[in-house]
Design a protein with these regions (language model features):
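Peripheral terminal and linker regions in Fe-S/redox and tRNA-modifying enzymes
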Residues: 1-279
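Amphipathic alpha-helix face/heptad-repeat signature
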Residues: 267, 293-294
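Inward-facing hydrophobic residues that define packing positions of alpha-helical scaffold repeats
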Residues: 275, 282, 287, 294-295
Length: 298
């Protein structure tokens, strides 16, 4: 999680934040303890972590002790165990599946069953609660996005599995292939199957990116097909991760998607409120806030 900056005599530290969740109390505590030790600004990374910059070598042990006390000194930033996930049904109006619960379950699988992958930065796992790519599932080595299936007259929480995405460098990238849809509770089995296959079948020194590209979408479909069998569903698989009631889909607004309302009219109302806020900020010469609200209204 540490690297030497191009500015002579300084280091930067990446902080792995599980699910990107950090409380305001912990944030304030970190800033208070690290003031004068790190740069005045803290950067948020695309994979939901933090970056502290301009740290002198003699201050590194102190920075580590502060992070360790806050439970944020775990290694493996940017590795396969550092799973990126959108909030999903925890807070999002459009979420279909509980992506944060899935992320925690998959992190446990990696840490317990594949410790040799903990520092592997060639493989990425990313999860979105719906088909929109807020969790960046379309550019993941192994991606998941929320969906649903019907079985035995009931709705089953499901995940669309994608394989083979990668950032190749020099402006090149590869979009992952949609492979198969499985019940959400089988996501750990999907990851275990894919990783065990890679361990046993890849050529020496062959990266997962190269291996998955060589094997292709049809290969992974056949590999994962047994996990899509809905005839073997257990009662637990009708409930999403972190839930104790049977899964159902709904459209709503606010922090809870359980209240059924007209989403379109509500979004228009919210846009009108943003426009009024932008006009108010503009009249008070709060230029940045005015621009923000005007942009949000669109």
């Amino acid at each position: 999680n540490l690297f030497k900056q191009k500015q002579e005599g300084y280091y930067a530290v990446y902080v792995r934040v599980p699910n990107g969740n950090i409380s305001s109390d912990v944030s304030r505590q970190l800033i208070a303890q690290l003031e004068g030790v790190i740069a005045d600004d803290v950067r948020v990374t695309i994979n939901q972590g933090l970056q502290f910059r301009f740290i002198k070598p003699e201050s590194l042990p102190y920075v580590y002790s502060v992070l360790d006390a806050a439970g944020l000194a775990a290694p493996g930033f940017g590795s396969v165990a550092d799973i990126t996930s959108c909030p999903g049904t925890d807070t999002c109006n459009l979420g279909i599946s509980n992506s944060t619960g899935t992320a925690l379950a998959l992190s446990e699988v990696i840490e317990e069953e594949f410790p040799e992958f903990l520092f592997n930065k060639d493989i990425t796992v990313r999860i979105s609660g719906c088909m929109n790519s807020c969790g960046q599932h379309g550019m993941a080595s192994v991606g998941f996005h929320g969906s649903s299936l019907k079985a035995k007259g009931q709705v089953v929480p499901a995940l669309q599995v994608l394989v083979g995405g990668a950032v190749l460098g020099s402006g090149d990238a590869r979009i992952s292939d949609k492979v198969i849809k499985v019940p959400s509770k089988r996501a750990p089995a999907v990851l275990t199957t894919i990783f065990n296959d890679y361990k046993t079948s890849a050529a020496a020194e062959e990266s997962f990116t190269d291996y998955s590209f060589r094997k292709g979408e049809k290969y992974y479909y056949e590999l994962l097909k047994p996990l899509a069998n809905l005839e073997t569903l257990s009662d637990d698989e009708f409930m999403d991760w972190g839930q104790e009631v049977k899964f159902s889909t709904a459209i709503g607004v606010g922090e809870c998607a359980g209240v059924m309302i007209d989403l379109v009219s509500t979004l228009i109302l919210e846009a009108e409120e943003k426009i009024l806020a932008a006009e108010d900020c503009f009249s008070n010469e709060q230029w940045a806030d005015s621009i923000y609200n005007a942009y949000a209204a669109q």
